[in-house]
Structure formats: structure tokens, C-alpha cells
Regions:
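Carbohydrate transferase catalytic cores enriched for Leloir-type hexosyltransferases
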Residues: 1-355
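Proline-aspartate-enriched helix->loop->beta-strand connector
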Residues: 80, 503-508, 513
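Acceptor-binding helix/loop patch of EC 2.4 sugar-transfer enzymes
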Residues: 101-125, 424-436, 541-559
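C-terminal amphipathic helix plus adjacent low-complexity
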Residues: 346, 350-365, 588-595
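N-terminal nucleotide/polyanion-binding subdomain common to many enzyme families
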Residues: 354-435, 440-441
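Venus flytrap/periplasmic-binding-protein-like
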Residues: 417-420, 529-545
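A transmembrane-helix-recognition feature enriched in membrane-embedded lipid enzymes
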Residues: 421-428, 548-595
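Conserved beta-alpha
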Residues: 423-498, 502
Length: 595
């Protein structure tokens, strides 16, 4: 895959986001993808082995505006399959001409109100949400961030996927254990909550205060002077160590030396160092909010970050009980084992491969015919019953009112977009359908694959004629049998028996919407290893009963006009009334979603 990665801002490689960018880029590179990175000056050397779109590092205001309104017009989007914005809670584009995944790490500004100046708070609370919503897919790095995206930025739930961060395992080193409590974070007040940690240390029993040192590596950030001033005036100031920024190479020794890792941040999108400490076997205590409570559940001692007393009690409980230390150490190692940067990269790639739009709560694939065929091939190889559907504007109009049909579509293994109506509706809602993946165009492609196919549906005689014409294609597929959709030639039981005896791979069901989806759904357990696909009027076209539109009409996406010409009485209501109704419903849906 040719992937465009926005790697700004990189924060000189000294923040949690810079770790995320560095490790995801490395994992995608190891998977063999062709990467082009957008970088500012501070990231150019780090990523010089890649093709770069390099931009000058500017102050925050100009960087935000340049990324929004200039950079998107500098990019040759046609060179790439898709784009990942690795820090979309910091920088976004005003337009996304190709499928774009926007990764949002946290919305801490809603939980730490004085985190930034007024301009940045306006940018984060008003500008970013508008442009992030335009991205085709949004990734939250934790369920906590996902909840915030829904509550504060009003992102539709169906647009959000949770792809957890990984972490880089800390190598084990032989070193002597020290009586030290560790907290690795940039020194940022009030967000990182160093002040309450210092106060909590002061509340520890005297013997613990004398025995332990509180070590706090991290670069100075906004508000650091407040933390340093308090520490300098504390009666425990000799027990506090601020080491400054620590390179990754020095982390193994720090973790190995520590008796306790404490993470009192007021809010975190993820909290990488918590997993690093768990992997290293260090007993952990952390805040009970945001992603920290999510990661620390049942594996760390939790506390309220706003209460120095609770933080002190948590530290005391762990430091005073060696058995509890061993228990937390074992649980932490087990939790950390489930996270890796390779899994993060795979999760991002899976979002692209299965990219979907949602209209009226119905999910459908927005990729290409080739990718749709690959999905079908994977299902056939699995040798178990699967349900695939096609949807167009008419289908979505039915799903708008028919909850049972809508649920069936949600339960399908795959749903493909057929027709210009679904494409227009998706575009109105901020999605991009790349190709018209319709059953009629797909049929000859399936016929050229080594499948065993059964034709089921249509009026008496239609399936038989379609079978003759399908066999005349002389493709690799074996068209093994057929039955009409009125059960005149064969009963349901006879059809089920025939499907089993003929070892059918793909069952094409042509009964019309929603009848065919309801039939497949209610009989899925009787279909053995068949992949059942609802194909509407396909057999009418294959049999020659109804002609297809000329190629020029198909290329212009107006095949529906030809169908209306051929069957005006049957299709007048569907197209002349149904299409405007569909557009109106999509418009109302968009208004409700953006409230």
C-alpha cells in the first residue's frame, strides 16, 4: 500500500504523540508498505529514510493554519491509496480527497480547562471538531477517548474505531533495586498532576518518606515552574528528583530500579509509560479516570487524581505489602502482553481494508470491486455460511423504516454499495464510495473464479435460462444448479439437500429486497458452507429477460434511467418518488447528526 502519513507535530521527539508517530511508522514499514511522511523540520532527520513532504516548523498559530488551509493543496493525492493523520487532535486538513483515518489521542482540554491559552482552546474546541468530522474514519486510542469524541465533538459513533496503542517492551537489565517511586511524564501543570503527587508523598508515613525517593523524569512544559517552586519549598525536597528528559535507552534501568510506578495524571488518552512499567514487572498505581482507569482496572491500585490523600494511601498500600507487590507485578505483565505496535498498525490497516460508510445506521463497504471480490474469496475459503448483501437508495429507504431489514443488513458479513444513490448519500454524510460495486458487474467476475455456484430465485423459467447463459460464459466457475424463487420446481428442503450434495460455494439469491435478505437470514443455519449473496434482479439480466443499459449510461451512473424506461409502471415509485425521498432523508439525517 502507498500510504501518506501526517507526522506533525513531532514535538522534537519528546512527547507521547512523538512516540506514537515513531512506532506506528516503524510498524507500517516492517509490514512492507510504501510510506510518504509529512514532517516539520524537527522530524526530518528522524525519518530521512522515507520520502518526505517537508514543511518549515512554524509557531503554533501559523502551523495550525498552514496545515489546515495550505498543506492540503500541496499534496498530490493521486499518488496514495489512503492517508493516516497520526495526531489529528493537534493538526488536521480542510479537505480529504482520499480515504483518511484521523487518529485522536485525547480531548484532555475538556477535563483540564486551563491546559492551554484561549486561542488554542478555541482552535481545539471549535475548529478541530469541524474538520476532524470530515475525515472518513476516526480512530480513538482508548474507549475513554471514544466516549469523549461522541460527547464533546459529536462524532457519530459508527465513524469511530478504537485501536489501542502499543508499547515498546523494556529490555530486562541486571541492576540493583532502589527505594524509589517513579513517574515518567513531561512536567506540565496542572494536567500531569505533579503537584498532587508531591503533596501525596508528603502525606506518607515518616519511615516511608525517609526510605524512598520520588524520581520524576520529563522535559519541562507549560506550568513546570509551578511544580519546581513547590518542590523547592517542600520539607521533602531532598527526596524529589527531577532528571529532565530521559532517552528511551535509559528507561530499562529506571524501571528495573523502581519499587513502584505511580501515574497520577488528571487525564490521559492512553498512558504508554503505564504499560512499560507493567511489562517491566513494576507494581503500579494510577488515576481512576480516562484511559488510565481503563488500563489499570484489576491490574493497578487506582486512586482519584484530585485527592493527595488517596494517592498517598495507594502508594502506602503497595509499598507496605510485598505480597501485594508480587500480585500487581504478575497482573501487570499479563495485561501488557496484549499490546504491541504491530497490533496497532494492523488495526489501522484493517480500518482501510474494511472501510465503511453508514447511512441510516446501515454499514456498507466503500472500496473497490477488486477488494470486494477479495472479501468474498476469503469468506468462501472459510467454508461456513455467510450472508452478503447489496444496497442502493431503494434498499436504504426500506431500511429507514424496516427495523428488521436494517438489523439483518447490520448482521451481514459484507454489504456492498450498488448505484449512484448510495454514493451520493454517503458523500452527503462525509464518506467517499470509490467504486460502484454492483451485482450485475460482479457476476462475470465471479464466473471466472473456481467456485461452485447455485442460482436461486426469479420467476419460473428465469433461473433455468440464466443457468444456460452462465454456463455459456465458459469461465472457471461451475454453475452446478438452479431453482426458481416461487418453489415451483423444487421445495425448500430439496434445495437445501441439493446445496449440500453439490458442495456449493456461492448461493445467489434473487428474490428482491427485503425478501431475499429475510430468507437468507432465517435459513443461514441450513446453508452449510455456502456464502449466500442477495442479488435482486440479477437473474433477469443474466437470463436476458431484461436488457442492461448501454455502456455509456452505466459509465455516467444513469443505468437507473434505462431501467425506468424498460419497466416504468414497476419502477416509477422507486425512482421518481424514492430517489428524492432518499436524498431528503439523508439531509435530515445529516442535520440531526450535526446538532
Amino acid at each position: 500500500m502507498k500510504i501518506l502519513l501526517s507526522a506533525i507535530p513531532f514535538d522534537n521527539g519528546k512527547s507521547g504523540i512523538s512516540v506514537y508517530i515513531r512506532e506506528v511508522v516503524k510498524a507500517l514499514e516492517e509490514q512492507g508498505h510504501s510510506l510518504t511522511l509529512i514532517v516539520e523540520d524537527d522530524g526530518a532527520k528522524e525519518f530521512e529514510r522515507f520520502e518526505l513532504i517537508r514543511i518549515k516548523k512554524r509557531n503554533a498559530l501559523f502551523s495550525m493554519l498552514y496545515s489546515l488551509f495550505v498543506l492540503p493543496f500541496r499534496i498530490n493525492w493521486k499518488k496514495f491509496d489512503f492517508c493516516i493523520m497520526l495526531a489529528a487532535n493537534r493538526r488536521v486538513f480542510c479537505r480529504y480527497p482520499i480515504f483518511t483515518i484521523a487518529v485522536v489521542h485525547d480531548l484532555s482540554q475538556y477535563h483540564v480547562p486551563v491546559k492551554y491559552d484561549k486561542f488554542r482552546m478555541f482552535y481545539i474546541k471549535k475548529v478541530l471538531p469541524y474538520y476532524v468530522r470530515k475525515a472518513q474514519s476516526i480512530v480513538a486510542i482508548s474507549n475513554s477517548t471514544r466516549s469523549d469524541l461522541i460527547e464533546y465533538w459529536h462524532i457519530p459513533e459508527e465513524k469511530i474505531s478504537v485501536v489501542y496503542n502499543g508499547f515498546t517492551p523494556i529490555p530486562a537489565v541486571e541492576t540493583q533495586k532502589k527505594k524509589q517511586i517513579l513517574y515518567i511524564s513531561r512536567i506540565e501543570h496542572p494536567g500531569k498532576n505533579h503537584l498532587n503527587l508531591l503533596k501525596a508523598f508528603e502525606l506518607l508515613p515518616e519511615e516511608l518518606k525517609k526510605e524512598y525517593t520520588l524520581v520524576m523524569p520529563g522535559a519541562a512544559w507549560n506550568g513546570a515552574e509551578t511544580v519546581f517552586e513547590y518542590a523547592g519549598n517542600s520539607p521533602c525536597k531532598e527526596q524529589f528528583q527531577f532528571t529532565g528528559f530521559v532517552d528511551f535507552a535509559k528507561l530499562p534501568e529506571l524501571y528495573s530500579q523502581s519499587s513502584l510506578y505511580v501515574f497520577p495524571s488528571r487525564f490521559e488518552g492512553f498512558g504508554l509509560s503505564l504499560l512499560e512499567a507493567m511489562h517491566a514487572g513494576v507494581p503500579c498505581a494510577c488515576s481512576n479516570n480516562s484511559s488510565l482507569g481503563e488500563l489499570g482496572q484489576d491490574t493497578a491500585e487506582l486512586f482519584s487524581p484530585s485527592s493527595p490523600q488517596e494517592i498517598a494511601e495507594a502508594m502506602k498500600k503497595i509499598l507496605s505489602d510485598s505480597n501485594y507487590q508480587q500480585e500487581l507485578s504478575a497482573k501487570g505483565r499479563a495485561k501488557a502482553a496484549g499490546f504491541s505496535w504491530q497490533n496497532t498498525a494492523k488495526g489501522l490497516m484493517e480500518i482501510y481494508r474494511s472501510r465503511r460508510a453508514f447511512t441510516f445506521g446501515v454499514p456498507f463497504f466503500t472500496g473497490t470491486m477488486e477488494e470486494a471480490l477479495f472479501q468474498i474469496d476469503c469468506m468462501v475459503r472459510e467454508k461456513r455460511a455467510r450472508h452478503i448483501a447489496f444496497i442502493n437508495a431503494h434498499c436504504l429507504n426500506i431500511a429507514y423504516k424496516n427495523r428488521e431489514y436494517k438489523q439483518i443488513l447490520n448482521d451481514c458479513a459484507a454489504v456492498f454499495a450498488d448505484g449512484i444513490g448510495a454514493k451520493i448519500g454517503a458523500k452527503m454524510l462525509g464518506y467517499k464510495v470509490e467504486e460502484n460495486v454492483n451485482g450485475t458487474d460482479m457476476f462475470p467476475l465471479l464466473a471466472d473464479k473456481p467456485y461452485r455456484i447455485y442460482l436461486f430465485g426469479g420467476a419460473p423459467g428465469v433461473a433455468e435460462k440464466a443457468l444456460v447463459n452462465a454456463r455459456a460464459l465458459n469461465g472457471k466457475a461451475v454453475f452446478a444448479g438452479c431453482a426458481d424463487g416461487f418453489f415451483k420446481s423444487k421445495s425448500e428442503e430439496e434445495i437445501f439437500a441439493e446445496l449440500a450434495s453439490l458442495e456449493i460455494d456461492i448461493l445467489l439469491v434473487a428474490m428482491g429486497v427485503p425478501k431475499q435478505e429475510e430468507w437468507i437470514n432465517s435459513h443461514l443455519d441450513r446453508l452449510g458452507s455456502c456464502t449466500a449473496i442477495g442479488v435482486g434482479g440479477l437473474l433477469d439480466f443474466v437470463s436476458g429477460r431484461i436488457p442492461r443499459a448501454p455502456m455509456w449510461m452505466r459509465k455516467l451512473n444513469i443505468e437507473w434511467c434505462f431501467r425506468l424506461y424498460c419497466e416504468p409502471s414497476r419502477l416509477f415509485r422507486r425512482y421518481i418518488i424514492g430517489n428524492p425521498l432518499f436524498i431528503g432523508r439523508v439531509f435530515l439525517s445529516k442535520l440531526r447528526r450535526n446538532k
